[in-house]
Amino acid sequence: MALFQLFSFLNVTLGLVSNIYNSTGHLSIDKACSGYSTEVFKGVCLPSYSYVKVDRHILTKDDRYYLGYAKATNREYQLYSLHIGTYDLFGSDIMSCGARGYALGLHNGDLELVLNYCRKVDGQKHIGEVFQSCRFVEYSEHMISGIVHSIPKDLMEEFSPIGKVPYFGIMPFRTECADQCSTKQAFYAMDAYPFYNIGYWFPLCADKYIPLCYSGRTDPCPLGYEERLIKVHSYMEGFESGMKTVCKSGEYIFPAWYSGQSEIYDTVVKPYIVNVPEYCGRFSRSDKSLVYSRFGFRGTIFSGLKVITLDGIDYLTTDFCVNYSMHHYVKPLVFERMRKSFICTSSGCLYKGFDVNHLHDICTPKLIVKRHEALISSFSFINTLGTKVGAVPYDFDGNIIQFIDVFSIDGFYVYSLSHKKIQTLTVMLVQSEEEWYMKLLHFVADDILRECLSTVFKVLFSAISACLSFIIDVGGCCFRQFIFVCLDSVILLLLLLPNYTHLTFILGFTLNAYIQLVYYESCCFRAYRDIAETIDL
């Protein structure tokens, strides 16, 4: 089945609203470089993989899904697989025999990882097998204790290809051989069978926008929400549209609590950890997206994408643009930068900053999409695939806008991040404009002020000139020369201020005084004339 058909399947079960499952954890390979090596499995140093969260869109009580953590190990290597949600494709119970579906999660193998722990019984390979009777035989608390058990080597099927980098993606599975394994329950007890999945029925505790924590274990919807049936269309051949049960209040829609087949729930799904309020704190919203790596390509699963419907037409947009365009909430940085961009002077007030109109224009919904495909096509394996159909702003940081580029491939969409610098805009908002009589007053004031200043400076300079003349008359010519030397020294001092030293100032003052009073002809000393007469002789 083609990869994009898998996306189409996810559209059926996940395609309406966003519900974020957040978790923190660490997956790694113990002694990944140790000596297990065959033609199929090459010993490879697999890096540790930290996972943050997974986007899901809609899961209802009419679907079957669970969380699982699988671990297979022997002395040479370990296999980890974190299944965050396994979805039923054909309407059968994933806990029964013959069920088929796809596991969306974190794996450290190929997309079609081959597992078969019933090989000794049926001798056949299956893709991502899930065995009910084998898996949940002798259920006990030590199943989730993390105790490492050894697997009998004759039960191990070669993992092909296991030497791949960890990736986040989809793994097909089907449940088989429950009847065959049921006769071997003692042999396949958990002590000898460490590969397991622990199942929990949804919903998970989510963020404050989608309250998935209930007051009771059997309540289909929390207080304030009513149970509704909605029709979900299918894009898979041979699979008809179905009715899904959801909880609805205002604009919020999320899955109703699964309450059917309580006997299976009680025997298989223990303990009740996803529906207890004290566990809700573990599922708080953090980062906006999960960044993953697959076969050397990096991609992002975006949680900020939204599809909004205006006049019956579906547009792709983002949380940032919806909030910005509708003036409901904007990242504080936007308001802060706008506030600092307003400048007021005596001539008026202006705005000099990022182009607000441009930001508003590119956030206006324009990119028409198919609602379901847009919400589930959140994988960006290779950025250059498909035809680019547009871009939507994703975030704003300073003068840089981050965009999500949208590419179309066979009716589905691939997203990748890009960025662009927003232009600076200058707009005069308020300009000072005076009345005619104010201009006349300014003209009169200018003339009066000019005359006043002119008179003040004339009187001041006349007083200084009279003082200097009096000093020279009283002190004589030599005293005048000394005053000039002092004034020169003041100028010298100002020039020396950046690198002032006492020695430099004293030497400069002495040299200047010698030149002014001794070397040149002056009324104080006649050394210059005596030297000149001596040279002439």
UniProtKB/Swiss-Prot annotation:
Q: Does the keyword Transmembrane apply?
A: yes
| Transmembrane region(s) | 459-479, 490-510
Annotated membrane topology is: Multi-pass membrane protein
Instruction: Indicate the principal place this protein occupies in or around the cell.
Output: host cell
The record's subcellular location field reads: Host membrane
GO cellular component assignments: host cell membrane; membrane
Per UniProt, the keywords (alphabetical) are:
Host membrane, Membrane, Signal, Transmembrane, Transmembrane helix
The signal peptide annotation in the UniProt record is 1-15
Protein name, UniProt field = Uncharacterized protein p61
Q: Which organism is it from?
A: Citrus leprosis virus C (isolate Citrus sinesis/Brazil/Cordeiropolis/2003)
At the highest ranks, the source species' classification is: Viruses, Riboviria, Orthornavirae, Kitrinoviricota, Alsuviricetes
